[in-house]
């Protein structure tokens, strides 16, 4: 039905044309151990609108109030799409007390997800299970995400077992895996 479904929140309500009240989920912690409450989200959003080129124009935030698990956002003009914009990847909620560790392609943050980035380089991210993840049991202990410069290198890595899964495999390379029972192809 194309409606936004809250994840870190349990509900949201447009109080009036310039105000949206968001109820945050209880029990969520950042990978740093800090509780994700309205104050933490406020800090993150205030940082976002101060450093991101598009966010101030999309979100139109005048000011934000934090009270426990209730975040109230006041806008300078009606912004009916604000909830959609908050779901944009630039709106990822991170722990600003932890900050951004490193620079550029090596930057790392404390988020709320099932994994913690333990090593970040421009071509690889190593993730380990977040033992304090609020969303249920995390089934895989470690994941390595690699970036490949070209499709041939990606295909070779899959064929040799250097990687166990891919996204963005070149279409003309599907024939190498399509009839092989050792591989499963999922597409949508």
PLM-predicted stretches and their roles:
Residues 13-23, 56-98:
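Surface-exposed binding/hinge segments that line
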Residues 132-176:
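Ligand-site clamp/hinge motif
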Residues 57-59, 175-187:
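Ligand-binding "clamshell"
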Residues 1-16, 46, 110-111:
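N-terminal lobe/hinge region of extracytoplasmic solute-binding protein
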Residues 10, 19-23, 41-44, 71-73, ...:
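Short, well-ordered beta-strand elements
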Residues 3, 87-138, 142, 152:
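Gly/Pro-rich hinge or "lid" segments in bacterial periplasmic/extracellular proteins
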Residues 17, 29, 46-53, 132, ...:
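Sec-exported extracytoplasmic/periplasmic mature domains
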